[in-house]
UniProtKB/Swiss-Prot annotation:
Region feature (Disordered): 40-79, 205-311, 406-460
Residue stretches in coiled coil: none
Pro residues bias locations: 212-223, 436-453
Keyword Phosphoprotein: yes
Location of Phosphoserine modifications: 281
Keyword Mitochondrion: no
Residue ranges, compositional bias (Basic and acidic residues): 248-272, 288-311
Full protein name: Probable fibrosin-1
Linked residues for Glycyl lysine isopeptide (Lys-Gly) (interchain with G-Cter in SUMO2): 8
Pfam families the record matches: Auts2 (PF15336)
Modified residues (Asymmetric dimethylarginine): 229, 239
Gene that produces this protein: FBRS
Keywords in alphabetical order: Isopeptide bond, Methylation, Phosphoprotein, Ubl conjugation
Amino acid sequence: MFEKYPGKMEGLFRHNPYTAFPPAVPGLPPGLPPAVSFGSLQGAFQPKSTNPELPPRLGPVPSGLSQKGTQIPDHFRPPLRKPGKWCAMHVRVAYMILRHQEKMKGDSHKLDFRNDLLPCLPGPYGALPPGQELSHPASLFTATGAVHAAANPFTAAPGAHGPFLSPSTHIDPFGRPTSFASLAALSNGAFGGLGSPTFNSGAVFAQKESPGAPPAFASPPDPWGRLHRSPLTFPAWVRPPEAARTPGSDKERPVERREPSITKEEKDRDLPFSRPQLRVSPATPKARAGEEGPRPTKESVRVKEERKEEAAAAAAAAAAAAAAAAAAATGPQGLHLLFERPRPPPFLGPSPPDRCAGFLEPTWLAAPPRLARPPRFYEAGEELTGPGAVAAARLYGLEPAHPLLYSRLAPPPPPAAAPGTPHLLSKTPPGALLGAPPPLVPAPRPSSPPRGPGPARADR
């Protein structure tokens, strides 16, 4: 069957990464197939060797010999034949077939070859439970179902590795259990106890630090054991017992939460008293709508309020005294300096109280100012009486004669330059008058005398 593959595939099957082969079944030599009959499959995996004296070699080919044989013939030793194709994989497959045949003889009514082959696979994952345990779910969740792997003759022992896997330094020397013993440690039946936080100390999925765990059921420390150490459920939050609670613990929490809010309310109430309001007279403080009256909570606040009231009263008295002194110094003639022009309301609307406020003052009513005549921009002369005054008033109202409007009546304009300096435009030079050509005047053409009226023509 394997003859159709090329020779390069032989190195794949011949290479053996393991140094030694522990015996799979007690009593059999390591590295050799079991000396039993293979039935109809006997010739499938037997080596194809023509020399009966040369036993088939197992494992890697010696370094001194090549797989294809030596190219130089040697007459002193028999020629090397092509070695057999037995390797570790052949032995493993043949052994698995043998076990399956023996199992089918005892349990002929069950056909489950897949579950039988899985426990025998070598590797760090260990063995899986056979089909007998998986077919009975009651044995998985009860304490009676957690039997030792040695009870099954076709399952490897917990303390033994695969038949072709030797123990090394990086692999845990302790075996892995083949049954789901952790499910038997649950408090309730089936999956109802998955939420229980209590696990058996000897279970496979229990913690490493759990006391009383036997070595065979302890969690392995190798990195592959992380898959087995993970719990089946997430750890649930454990509510503290009633004894751990104190009767006053629940009542203290609302008080602690209320303290910041009370402090904030006090700060909001004290805020108007700590900062002065803008655009508000200190003598007449106004309270905001919905705000309580003055509530002095501390002695410092009271002292500040008293000082503010005293300062406001002193400022009002000083302002009144300054106004009276200014009115006495200026007198009734300078009262217009004290009264500022009232500002008009928005959009120049009517506001008689604001405009008449200055005239209703007591000082204005007591001594009103004297109305002064408007200033004159000309000197006052003697007033004329009689008919001459009317003519003078008429002439005074007329506009003076402008030289540009009346050029004939206007005197000649003065020279632009000084009188001592010669002016170029004052007179025409004589050379220009003598050298100028005479004006060209066309002579009139002689015209024929006009005709008199003659007889009318017939054709017209």
